[in-house]
């Protein structure tokens, strides 16, 4: 009998700590732009700007699939 292999969606994810909330973005304000400090992995200690969908507050831990991309700054038109 073959052994079943289960893949977790967080298998390759890296933990990051929300250190600052920059503002809301998106057409209806459904996305929050935050600064995240990487807690583990190759980029440990690096601070990224990312967009987070859903509720988020200071001190939350978010799981990032990759740590290469950064969000563009929110600019007023």
Curated annotation (Swiss-Prot):
A Gene Ontology biological process term: translation
InterPro entries listed in its UniProt record: NA-bd_OB-fold (IPR012340), Ribosomal_eS28 (IPR000289), Ribosomal_eS28_CS (IPR028626)
Top-level taxon of the source organism: Archaea
GO terms under cellular component: cytosolic small ribosomal subunit
SUPFAM superfamilies the record matches: Nucleic acid-binding proteins (SSF50249)
GO molecular function per UniProt: structural constituent of ribosome
UniProtKB keywords: Ribonucleoprotein, Ribosomal protein
Keyword set includes Nucleotide-binding: no
Family: Belongs to the eukaryotic ribosomal protein eS28 family.
UniProt-listed PANTHER family: 40S RIBOSOMAL PROTEIN S28, SMALL RIBOSOMAL SUBUNIT PROTEIN ES28
Record's protein name: Small ribosomal subunit protein eS28
Organism: Pyrobaculum aerophilum (strain ATCC 51768 / DSM 7523 / JCM 9630 / CIP 104966 / NBRC 100827 / IM2)
